[in-house]
Amino acid sequence: MGDWHRAFTQNTLVPPHPQRARQLGKESTAFQCILKWLDGPLIKQGILDMLSELECHLRVTLFDVTYKHFFGRTWKTTVKPTNQPSKQPPRITFNEPLYFHTTLSHPSIVAVVEVVTEGRKRDGTLQLLSCGFGILRIFGNKPESPTSAAQDKRLRLYHGTPRALLHPLLQDPIEQNKFMRLMENCSLQYTLKPHPPLEPAFHLLPENLLVSGFQQIPGLLPPHGDTGDALRKPRFQKPTTWHLDDLFFTLYPSLEKFEEELVQLLISDREGVGLLDSGTLEVLERRLHVCVHNGLGFVQRPQVVVLVPEMDVALTRSASFSRKISASSKNSSGNQALVLRSHLRLPEMVSHPAFAIVFQLEYVFNSPSGADGGASSPTSISSVACMHMVRWAVWNPDLEVGPGKVTLPLQGGVQQNPSRCLVYKVPSASMSSEEVKQVESGTIQFQFSLSSDGPTEHANGPRVGRRSSRKMPASPSGTPAPAARDLAATQDSPVGPGLSLSQLTASPLSPALQSSSKPPLQPPDSSQSPEGPQLQAESVLESRVSHLEADLSQPASLQGTPAVEHLQELPFTPLHAPIVVGAQTRSSRSQLSRAAMVLLQSSGFPEILDASQQPVEAVNPIDPVRFNPQKEESDCLRGNEIVLQFLAFSRAAQDCPGTPWPQTVYFTFQFYRFPPETTPRLQLVKLDGTGKSGSGSLSHILVPINKDGSFDAGSPGLQLRYMVDPGFLKPGEQRWFAHYLAAQTLQVDVWDGDSLLLIGSAGVQMKHLLRQGRPAVQVSHELEVVATEYEQEMMAVSGDVAGFGSVKPIGVHTVVKGRLHLTLANVGHACEPRARGSNLLPPSRSRVISNDGASFFSGGSLLIPGGPKRKRVVQAQRLADVDSELAAMLLTHTRAGQGPQAAGQEADAVHKRKLERMRLVRLQEAGGDSDSRRISLLAQHSVRAQHSRDLQVIDAYRERTKAESIAGVLSQAITTHHTLYATLGTAEFFEFALKNPHNTQHTVAIEIDSPELSIILDSQEWRYFKEATGLHTPLEEDMFHLRGSLAPQLYLRPRETAHIPLKFQSFSVGPLAPTQAPAEVITEKDAESGPLWKCSAMPTKHAKVLFRVETGQLIAVLCLTVEPQPHVVDQVFRFYHPELTFLKKAIRLPPWHTLPGAPVGMPGEDPPVHVRCSDPNVICEAQNVGPGEPRDVFLKVASGPSPEIKDFFVVIYADRWLAVPVQTWQVCLHSLQRVDVSCVAGQLTRLSLVLRGTQTVRKVRAFTSHPQELKTDPAGVFVLPPHGVQDLHVGVRPRRAGSRFVHLNLVDIDYHQLVASWLVCLSCRQPLISKAFEITMAAGDEKGTNKRITYTNPYPSRRTYRLHSDRPELLRFKEDSFQVAGGETYTIGLRFLPSGSAGQEEILIYINDHEDKNEETFCVKVLYQ
């Protein structure tokens, strides 16, 4: 309970003024205030003389100007040092975010910011001084209008302390009061703006509480990334439900005596006379308030229940219940207790040490009218107005323990309680023992249990009405909770996590080959690959990857057959999986016709020119590329301008003709280490005169859309340029960039610009961009845009078909959605070389770092950094000119007697000294008369005295810093600096040659300050790295002595040199920011002002290794500078998953021997597979299997709240020591709101989704990924009112049985932003087939066939029927609906469309009634011969 008490006592709030009535009809407004920096000379010279070690911080308090009342709690920033550089003006930087919310929206409510300095007195005590304050206006002059300015503002500061605001002469507006003295040249830079993302967290933060964004709030998760601001976009911990039963109170010494004394004391307190008859006041009710408290405030309104005496319950219940209560209250020594007859349920508990359950016992008293024999006066006690809290208790449950019984002591008296009200006194404890003190105030006892049905409120905050009733609560394991109470018996104890079933297979050549009936093409011979052995070695793994997910739930045969059909979790797989691109992926083999090529060339696409304004040489994408790294590095054109030109997007012939074609598209990709690119929306303009549909047809060109929505078809295409020149690349990075172009495949995701749904992905190799000495080169590609759809087949009826833990495959359909026409170019540019340090040289690849220990100090100034390293003669300089700290001390000493005003006028010591010298020169020139000579002598005397004082200060300063400076120079003499160029997951191996510089032996302890840098302790691992790098230094067995968690030790003989093997390996990457919305339109003016090729920052890392002998003395220091380099992403996986659940994936690797260029292991054995993940919160592992068995990489990752996107990398190794990754995968997990729908194939199922309006009016439209099976009402554009609630009606008619996943997006059509997104999980069962037919058709027949079938109305009345089919592309009806009288027969006309290939198809015909409910289903088997 310490954590709760600590949070509770540290967050005590002063309430607002009683006259400032809380406006209950208004909502609380959230604010974010960022205090950036202080400008100006705030600290006076007198403070500098009086205090040392000066530091500064800010304090913020809410203040009511009208009632002159401070309220809330004073918030403090972190303490910052005041010793700033000598620049003008002085600045102290804070950059701290402050958050709060309040309902007191009135201009008189302000925030007072106080500047406080703290320092040490001469006796060592801490002294706090106020240096000024400012008045920050939260609300505008108009009431209820919060300030909306988000830009930086300056807050003027005033002399004095905020206590001056309590003076009666300071009236509003206080800024214009004559008593307020403004501080010149002093201000505070800040921003203040409303912060709506804080609104879901109002239940965790009390009103008027000022909190920092860096403060840990109980109930909130830590923020993503390294910003540390948890309130900028709050993320909530998942709540759990706790149940309390058999609750009763025991009061001391007995319930009767306790209540009798309480009534008598209340009567005495109210009447002010002696004890009266207790009949004038009686107990009406005994209430219990129960609520969850997070240390800051109550999470929800308390639940109020009524307690009754134990005997009252026993008289109204059965004998068994009476025995139960009597047994539970044996410890009360026969005393009567207060019992709760109901069950308590607390769904808002969170697994956090500061969360506690608060119990408050309240008594309600009744004063009968005329109890004393007279008429009731207006001042008498009313019948229900007398309520008093008498006891309270706090329980901090351990959420990891199981159900049990708890007994808590009750508390009372003057100590603080969560309700901040007066509590009835406790008995005197002066003569009591510790055991008696625990029970003499009373006890509370109850049974508790943790519910397994999961929370009933949304994890984003358990606010009333926040979650729509259509969604079922999700359990911690991801299994939906039962919809009825009858299911609780089995659903409360799930036997397994209920994993979903999925399988994905991608072809190594073209992903479209999976859906084709033709046999797959044979992979090319690796010996004939034009890429050479170097690229073959990089292509260890490629595109054949399978996804498997095991169903660990126990089958029905093991559970027993239940009486009720239980709800089953819908197995989930993503709708769109990425095309898995590998090193062998090529552009489509289908070529455009010559007529289409002419049409493409004549469309007016801008021509790409080289540096000489000449057309760029075009190469054939099927031509081999011979990569010569030396030729690429010796190119005189050091700049590479990479051009990506998007030309056209054509619809594929294999695409379903009923699917609507998008009107606009946009693309997302990432090139090298530039930021992730999201292009503007592009209009698809249909070309006239295109050929007939075929694999090589060209249908639509891409045209940029203007900001007003118009487009000009005369300037088609989108061109993006990336400039990679020596100014962009780091030293030695040219080699990395050439390798990137040679080995990497660029993945481009194609999105619908209107619905923001993923259409598909395409992959293009960039090896043709290697210029190999040419001035420029370009290549045109026609790329297949592929989408992979998953469908769960009908599950087996019997549980015995698939045993426990078996893997069940699902149907995977790979569909070619279209073809993207793309041109890539690389234009060479001549660049100026760098002034110092040539980037032409590759980074140092030396594996041995030498340090012979013979370095020494060659003399020189200890005050000049790097002085001993200088080898040239320089002019002597004054010490104060090269040491700013010494100059500040000399200036402070000079102005010690001039007062703070003179000290604040000039702070530059060098400038002051120059003015002094000029004054002396002028005095000497004017030295003719006696007065001038006398003045000159006095000045010279003053200068000599000043110089003498300066020499004393310099001598004292030198003595103080001598030891530190000598130690620094000696440390530099034994320090070796080295730079590493590391990539994600790659182990950088090197050896440090450590020499013992002494004539005696030493045991050296090796200390490393970075977890990513380690010593290689295993001799086999050391030998492996030596052989891999070709290093021939000595290798020793058992070189280090290990002492548990302490630093390893090494024994060195006198003057001996030993090679220390070290390895640096990092799995951390910077935060990624993928987007699912198109970018703004980029005009030529914008492109000139802000180039598109600005790179993303890759921070430099540092590590230090200390070599320390037994005495603690350092004999060597190794300082490593690690420059992170971009890594190659071989495959990108994009998954869509329900929010706040676990995604469990098993990605199957292909057989090892089928991969060209794969490493060769032992005969008949596959090399081991190891995996690592960049996110420590993701569970990632690869299990070892037997020879010839498939290998699976298992992933388990928690999805966040919708619409969060989580990105991480998976690194795969094929060696035991994790030296070099053979593949790197990027995984993107999209979290969506989940809607489960159970339906029948061919039958319409209706449901409604609740839409909640934002703060403004928005014109929105609903889009779906399967418009043939899911319809919405309204179908077009409609208005979503602000803060309103509106229903979106959805109609689902699946065509086939099984489980499918449909995306539903609500998009703002004006700004093309995603307002809401759902993942509709369809669980569709097949209706009963009443009749079956079979026909035969000629394959390739262009005419088709007409057939007829009959249907008899089984009802006695006339009925209307509707016809539907699961294959509308193969079967059409003569009439979509018909009417038939009762008992009559109707003939249905069928039109079977031709098929281009031989085979057989089963077509279902659904006959529905007027309400679209299925009446009968026919099956027609069509044989194409």
Curated annotation (Swiss-Prot):
Subcellular location: Cytoplasm, Cytoskeleton, Cilium basal body; Cytoplasm, Cytoskeleton, Microtubule organizing center, Centrosome; Cell junction, Tight junction
Tissue specificity comment: Expressed in the retina (at protein level).
Stretches for region Disordered: 448-554
Compositionally biased region (Low complexity): 473-484, 507-530
Keywords of the record: Cell junction, Cell projection, Cilium, Cytoplasm, Cytoskeleton, Phosphoprotein, Tight junction
One GO CC annotation: nuclear body
InterPro entries: NPHP4
Keyword Phosphoprotein: yes
One annotated GO biological process: negative regulation of canonical Wnt signaling pathway
Residue ranges of the region described as Sufficient for basal bodies localization: 822-1425
Phosphoserine found at: 145
Function: Involved in the organization of apical junctions; the function is proposed to implicate a NPHP1-4-8 module. Does not seem to be strictly required for ciliogenesis. Required for building functional cilia. Involved in the organization of the subapical actin network in multiciliated epithelial cells. Seems to recruit INT to basal bodies of motile cilia which subsequently interacts with actin-modifying proteins such as DAAM1.
Subunit (UniProt): Interacts with NPHP1 and RPGRIP1L/NPHP8; NPHP1, NPHP4 and RPGRIP1L are proposed to form a functional NPHP1-4-8 module localized to cell-cell contacts and the ciliary transition zone; NPHP4 mediates the interaction between NPHP1 and RPGRIP1L. Interacts with IQCB1/NPHP5; the interaction likely requires additional interactors. Interacts with RPGRIP1, CEP164, JADE1, PALS1, INADL, PARD6A, INVS, DVL2. Interacts with INTU; INTU mediates the interaction between NPHP4 and DAAM1. Interacts with JADE1. Interacts with SPATA7.
Family named by the database record: Belongs to the NPHP4 family.
Name assigned to this protein: Nephrocystin-4
The gene coding this protein: Nphp4
